[in-house]
């Protein structure tokens, strides 16, 4: 669908009587969650007079088995046939394989790609985005640098020179795609007006979004829970039962909170009770892709690598938990914290073959007595 076909634009915006500036939104990423995000946003830009109707979605171009380009198929069918089959994205979503072209007119940028690609994407966009643009990261993960861990929102802010909020929550994408009720949390820093604009852009009757002034807390919840989900998958693969899984989730939540507050003392306790915290942890440990692949890893006795299982089971989607466990392990080792975080440490050591999957319950929590 070409932008010129969006005949609804003028009708909606002129009939509203709104004369102020209109924001343009681009979604950078088009996987499972990126496609669902575009669908949510596209529903609201049609209704909200302060937004242009069209939503651009940058697609990392792929050739489908049919020989067709993924971008062409999305624009012809209004459906991401590879990463979100069977779901219409909205007639105002336009897929674009050219990253710079996709973002050039946007003043609201939504980033939703695997976290390991973000530094490269940001470097490609340096000097190419509108002055005063706002960013929102839906990305779960961190970059580990010599000077310490760098959250993805900070990476975006530092490289692009723009403010970046985050959105995290108990959000299994396929359930939101079919409009099952769920919640999410926007984390912001100081500017509540911008946060409320993001809340407005994502909120629907089936997707409830709230905002909290705690970017690091919200983002770390979304990042660290994937490590705990890997542990939960090991428990499932070894058929250890619900009591064991509940214990692993509790210990994991405790380590999530402790790690977050050691890195960023400003992180708020209440953030862990938002959708981005305990709710996201529960849903990811019950139904997410990290749990699913970790279960298969444990059933195979750790004899098949996560890379092999990911390629076989996820149809091009990427795991986040294994790479995040590695990144967190590096931080723990560098700061001398390994013994303080036995669950996080053990997940990485199992994932890399240093320990068997059964080791997930073979450590002591005695040294994890934190004051918070």
UniProtKB/Swiss-Prot annotation:
Binding site for NAD(+): 29-34, 60, 117, 140, 173, 289, 318, 320
Chain sites annotated for binding substrate: 140, 289-290
Keywords attached to this entry: NAD, Oxidoreductase
Active site: 225
EC id: 1.1.1.8
Domain of life the protein comes from: Eukaryota
Disordered: region residues: 1-23
BP-aspect Gene Ontology terms: carbohydrate metabolic process; glycerol-3-phosphate catabolic process
GO terms for cellular component: cytosol
Record field: compositional bias (Polar residues): 1-16
Pfam families in UniProt: NAD_Gly3P_dh_C, NAD_Gly3P_dh_N
Catalytic activity: sn-glycerol 3-phosphate + NAD(+) = dihydroxyacetone phosphate + NADH + H(+)
One function term, GO molecular function aspect: protein homodimerization activity
PROSITE patterns, A to Z: NAD_G3PDH
Family: Belongs to the NAD-dependent glycerol-3-phosphate dehydrogenase family.
Protein name, as recorded: Glycerol-3-phosphate dehydrogenase [NAD(+)]
Species: Cuphea lanceolata
């Amino acid at each position: 669908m070409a932008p010129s076909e969006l005949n609804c634009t003028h009708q909606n915006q002129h009939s509203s009587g709104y004369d102020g500036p209109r924001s343009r939104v681009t979604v950078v990423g088009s996987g499972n969650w990126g496609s669902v995000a575009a669908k949510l946003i596209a529903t609201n830009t049609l209704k909200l007079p302060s937004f242009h109707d069209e939503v651009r979605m940058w697609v990392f171009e792929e050739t489908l088995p049919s020989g067709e380009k993924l971008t062409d198929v999305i624009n012809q069918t209004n459906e991401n046939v590879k990463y979100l089959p069977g779901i219409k994205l909205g007639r105002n979503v336009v897929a674009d394989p050219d990253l710079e072209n996709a973002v050039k007119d946007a003043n609201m940028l939504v980033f939703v790609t695997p976290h390991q690609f973000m530094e490269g994407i940001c470097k490609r966009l340096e000097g190419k985005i509108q002055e005063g643009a706002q960013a929102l990261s839906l990305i779960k993960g961190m970059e580990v640098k010599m000077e310490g861990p760098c959250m993805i929102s900070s990476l975006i802010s530092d490289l692009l020179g723009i403010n970046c909020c985050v959105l995290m929550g108990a959000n299994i994408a396929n359930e939101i795609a079919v409009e099952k009720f769920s919640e999410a949390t926007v984390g912001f820093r100081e500017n509540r007006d911008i946060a409320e604009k993001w809340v407005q852009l994502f909120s629907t009757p089936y997707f409830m979004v709230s905002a909290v002034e705690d970017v690091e807390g919200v983002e770390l919840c979304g990042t660290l829970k994937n490590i705990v989900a890997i542990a939960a998958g090991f428990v499932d693969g070894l058929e250890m039962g619900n009591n064991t899984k509940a214990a692993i989730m509790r210990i994991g939540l405790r380590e999530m909170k402790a790690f977050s507050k050691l890195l960023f003392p400003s992180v708020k306790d209440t953030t862990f009770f938002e959708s981005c915290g305990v709710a996201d942890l529960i849903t990811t440990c019950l139904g997410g892709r990290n749990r699913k692949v970790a279960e298969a890893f444990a059933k195979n006795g750790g004899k098949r690598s996560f890379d092999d299982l990911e390629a076989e089971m996820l149809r091009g989607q990427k795991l986040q938990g294994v790479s995040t466990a590695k990144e967190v392990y590096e931080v723990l080792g560098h700061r001398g914290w390994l013994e303080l975080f036995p669950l996080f440490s053990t997940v990485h050591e199992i994932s890399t073959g240093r320990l068997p999957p059964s080791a997930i319950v073979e450590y002591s929590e005695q040294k994890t007595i934190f004051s918070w």
